[in-house]
């Protein structure tokens, strides 16, 4: 029988992050979908995460001074333990560090238009992910089929202290090699 010799293609994918529908998980987890992210009105990942009560300001002396390589960074700081103890993943994989010599991720490097959902483990996850996940894990899931163009313009302000803000973002995306790859270009001002 020749049909017994033919192997079917088996694809196994997984994540160590428990899904939100698993309410019996002992680890506290918050999931924000695309609609929830849009409803926040936030213009970047940093502002979205800082809406969570578990997140503290990621600003520290290291990213407010004028040293090369660290000024202007926006990082996440879960449970007040410091951004160096919060692991940031993109699609379940470690993201490049924004500060040379550390694993601290600059959230400015992730275009908001491409985010499908955010998964935040707010309990310690160092036993699964290592010592840089003592405070928790932020997993940013990106859209894998973004094609076309997205234009976003936001205007805001407040009365005290000259608080007018304007943000514009244009994102282009295209599929390559019959859907096996893609390229995305984002401009933000």
Regions found by a protein language model. Give the residues of each.
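Short acidic/polar hinge/loop motifs at secondary-structure boundaries
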Residues: 93-122
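N-terminal periplasmic accessory domains that precede
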Residues: 45-48, 74-77, 106-108, 132-153, ...
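Transmembrane beta-barrel outer-membrane domains
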Residues: 69, 131, 161-165
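Outer-envelope beta-barrel architecture signal
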Residues: 86, 145-149, 179-183
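Short, polar/charged loop or turn motifs at beta-strand boundaries
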Residues: 27-47, 66, 75-81, 105-108, ...
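Short, acidic, small-residue-rich periplasmic hinge/interaction motif at the N-terminus
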Residues: 1-38, 46
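Extracytoplasmic beta-strand/coil segments of soluble accessory domains associated
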Residues: 50-94
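Short strand-turn segments of transmembrane beta-barrel domains in outer membranes
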Residues: 119, 124, 146-174, 185
């Amino acid at each position: 029988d020749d049909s017994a010799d033919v192997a079917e293609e088996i694809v196994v994918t997984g994540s160590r992050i428990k899904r939100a529908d698993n309410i019996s998980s002992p680890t506290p987890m918050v999931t924000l979908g695309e609609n929830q992210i849009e409803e926040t009105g936030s213009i970047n990942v940093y502002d979205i995460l800082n809406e969570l009560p578990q997140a503290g300001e990621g600003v520290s002396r290291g990213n407010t001074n004028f040293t090369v390589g660290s000024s202007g960074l926006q990082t996440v700081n879960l449970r007040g333990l410091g951004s160096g103890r919060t692991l940031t993943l993109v699609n379940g994989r470690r993201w490049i560090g924004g500060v040379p010599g550390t694993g601290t991720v600059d959230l400015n490097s992730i275009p908001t238009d491409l985010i499908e959902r955010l998964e935040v483990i707010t309990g310690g996850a160092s036993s699964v992910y290592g010592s840089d996940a003592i405070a928790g894990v932020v997993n940013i899931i990106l859209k894998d089929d973004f094609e076309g163009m997205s234009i976003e313009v936001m205007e805001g302000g407040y009365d005290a202290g000259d608080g007018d803000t304007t943000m514009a973002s244009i994102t282009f995306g295209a599929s390559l090699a019959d859907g096996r790859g893609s390229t995305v270009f984002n401009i933000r001002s």
